[in-house]
C-alpha cells in the first residue's frame, strides 16, 4: 500500500486515540450509535481490535478474542502502543500487511472512533479521503450475510446523495449519521 494510505490510517488512529483519552468516567455508560455498545464497550472494542490487528500484522499468534477484551486503567495508552505497531507494520510492508487491507483497518477505527466521538459530544474531523478508502474497502469485502440483527454490521442506512464521505461510511455500516446522544 502507499505511504498516503498509511498516513490516512495514522490520522484516523491519532484522532481515535485522542477521543479515547477524552472519555470521562461519567461518560462510560452513555449509549452510542452502535446499539449493542455503551461508551465503555466501544473503548474496550477499539483497544481490543487495535491490539488484535497489531498482533496479526506482526505475524505473532493471536491470544484471545478482541471482542472480549477489557481495557485497563489507561486505555488511550494501550491504544497508542498498538496503533504504533499497526503503522510500523504497514510502513515496513511485510507479508502480513499485504493480507490485511489498510482500508479495512481504517474502517474499523474510523467508524468506532466516530461512534465514540458522537456519543461523548466531541466533534470529528476524519478525512474524507480516509472515509472514501474505508467505504470502498467495505463495499468490496462486506457480504450481505454479515448484516442484520446479531451480525457484525447493521443494514445500510439511506443518506442523501449530497452526504459527506464520513456520513456515507457510517451509514453503510448501519449507523444513522444524524444520531444524537440523549444527554452528554
Question: Which residues are covered by each model-predicted region?
Answer:
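Structured surface interface patches that mediate subunit assembly and partner/cofactor docking
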Residues: 2-18, 22-35, 48, 52-184
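Extended, alpha-helix-rich binding/interface surfaces that flank or overlap catalytic cores
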Residues: 42
Amino acid at each position: 500500500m502507499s505511504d498516503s494510505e498509511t498516513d490516512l490510517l495514522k490520522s484516523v488512529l491519532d484522532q481515535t486515540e485522542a477521543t479515547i483519552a477524552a472519555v470521562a468516567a461519567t461518560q462510560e455508560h452513555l449509549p452510542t450509535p452502535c446499539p449493542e455498545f455503551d461508551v465503555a464497550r466501544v473503548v474496550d472494542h477499539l483497544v481490543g481490535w487495535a491490539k488484535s490487528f497489531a498482533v496479526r500484522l506482526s505475524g505473532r499468534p493471536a491470544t484471545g478474542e478482541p471482542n472480549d477484551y477489557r481495557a485497563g486503567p489507561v486505555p488511550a495508552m494501550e491504544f497508542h502502543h498498538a496503533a504504533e505497531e499497526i503503522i510500523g507494520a504497514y510502513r515496513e510492508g511485510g507479508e502480513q500487511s499485504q493480507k490485511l487491507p489498510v482500508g479495512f483497518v481504517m474502517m474499523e477505527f474510523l467508524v468506532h472512533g466516530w461512534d465514540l466521538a458522537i456519543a461523548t459530544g466531541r466533534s470529528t474531523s476524519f478525512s474524507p479521503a480516509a472515509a472514501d478508502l474505508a467505504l470502498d474497502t467495505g463495499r468490496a469485502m462486506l457480504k450481505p450475510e454479515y448484516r442484520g440483527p446479531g451480525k457484525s454490521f447493521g443494514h445500510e442506512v439511506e443518506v442523501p446523495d449530497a452526504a459527506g464521505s464520513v456520513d456515507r461510511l457510517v451509514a453503510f455500516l448501519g449507523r444513522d449519521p444524524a444520531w444524537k446522544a440523549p444527554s452528554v
